[in-house]
C-alpha cells in the first residue's frame, strides 16, 4: 500500500478551516484531479476524477467525522483509497492541517499531490477565493 502524509499551517481559526474542508462538494476547488463531488446521503458521496486523461467515477464513504478535529474516508469503488485529514489549533488564528492518503495504486507523485492539495487549500482559505 502506498501512503503519503504532509501538514501545512493555515492562517485561520480551526473552526473556519474545518468548516471549509467539511464542505466536501467543494473538494474539486483544491484537489485538482477531482472534477465533481455530490452528496448521496450523510456519509456517502459520488465523485468523478480525471487521472491519466481518463474520466472515472466512484463513491467514497465518510467513516469518521469529529467536528473541528478530523474527517476520515475510504473509497467504495474503483480501487481502494483511504484518507484522513486532521485539524489542530496552533493558536487562535493558526491551524495545522495534516493530510494522509493511502492507496493500492502506486502513483509516483502521491506525495507531491498531497503537498499540492494542502497548498491549494491554504490559498483557498487564506485568500477567500473560490478556486485555489
Predicted regions and their residues:
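Hydrophobic ligand-binding cavity/cleft-lining segments
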Residues: 1-44, 120
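Short, surface-exposed coil-to-beta transition loops
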Residues: 3-5, 55-59, 80-84
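Generic structural detector for well-ordered beta-strands
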Residues: 7-11, 38, 48, 61, ...
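Residue-level signal for tight coil/turn positions that link beta-strands
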Residues: 12, 41-42, 66-68, 92
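Ser/Thr-rich, low-complexity intrinsically disordered terminal regions
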Residues: 43-49, 54, 66, 72
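Short, cysteine-centered beta-strand-loop-beta hairpins and adjacent loop/turn segments enriched
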Residues: 52-56, 105-106
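Beta-strand/loop substructures that line and gate deep hydrophobic ligand-binding cavities in soluble
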Residues: 61-64, 70-132
Amino acid at each position: 500500500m502506498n501512503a503519503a502524509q504532509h501538514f501545512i499551517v493555515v492562517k485561520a481559526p480551526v473552526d473556519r478551516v474545518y468548516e471549509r474542508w467539511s464542505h466536501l462538494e467543494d473538494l474539486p476547488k483544491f484537489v485538482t484531479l477531482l472534477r465533481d463531488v455530490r452528496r448521496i446521503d450523510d456519509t456517502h458521496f459520488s465523485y468523478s476524477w480525471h487521472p491519466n486523461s481518463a474520466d472515472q467515477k466512484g463513491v467514497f464513504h465518510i467513516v469518521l467525522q469529529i467536528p473541528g478535529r478530523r474527517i476520515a474516508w475510504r473509497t467504495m469503488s474503483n480501487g481502494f483509497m483511504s484518507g484522513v485529514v486532521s485539524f489542530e489549533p496552533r493558536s487562535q488564528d493558526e491551524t495545522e492541517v495534516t493530510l494522509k492518503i493511502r492507496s493500492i495504486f502506486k502513483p509516483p507523485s502521491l506525495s507531491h499531490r498531497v503537498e499540492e492539495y494542502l497548498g491549494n487549500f491554504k490559498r483557498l482559505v487564506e485568500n477567500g477565493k473560490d478556486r485555489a
